[in-house]
Amino acid sequence: MKALVTGGEGGIGRAIRARLEREGYEVESLDLATGFDVTDPEAWERVEAVHLAFLNAGITTGQMNLRRLEPEQYRRVVAVNVDGVVLGVLRLVRVMKSGSIVATASLAGLTAIPTDAVYTLSKHAIVGFVRSAAPLVKPIRLNAICPGMTDTTMIDSQRPLFDAVGFPLLEPDEVAEAAWLAATSGRTGECWYVQPGREPAPFRFPNVPGPRRDGEAVGRPPLPSEPPS
């Protein structure tokens, strides 16, 4: 059995790889450190079918002040965090006949995180993409995990604050376990929240109020159907 992990050399990526290897998977790490750029469409064209794929590569702007944010910082975060997922899914659904794809979003994909608005934007994009694309790529399953603050190098600049107030952090192994659960649950189109002290579970999104006509509720609009090719 084969699997791939993007961002496989980071803290969460290494933990996911280790979790998969314990299950007997042959795991390929796709990371800048291994010569793979998730933002490059040509790089994705070299990727072949796997049983499980974890699209985990992600970065932050490192900039809390929008007035100081450079356009290049914005573009880089969107390229890695959003393009790195979308390009991966576009390739994988062409070469996989079944199996499971899990994207690493964040709690920042489920709520507002003012400390990094662009990172939050990118993770909301992943959540929206996964929920919308999942019905279109069956029988491949597509889910996201949305971990809270995790003890990796990404939070190094904030670590003194977390330590000072005793804020609990997730361990990478906990996130990896949630990723495995999302991949093997048999569900699709779900966004699993991961928080310290709680069992991972699909987030329940509130329903959007629907339209009304002549005082009566109207159902969903008809959607065009297109058979998978």
Predicted segments, located by residue:
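Active-site loop immediately N-terminal to the catalytic Tyr-X3-Lys motif
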Residues: T111-V118
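Active-site-adjacent segment of SDR/Rossmann-fold oxidoreductases
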Residues: V95-M96, T111, S132-R141
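N-terminal Rossmann NAD(P)H-binding glycine-rich loop of SDR-like oxidoreductase domains
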Residues: E9, R17
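Substrate-binding pocket helix/loop in short-chain dehydrogenase/reductase
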Residues: M64-L66, Q73-R75
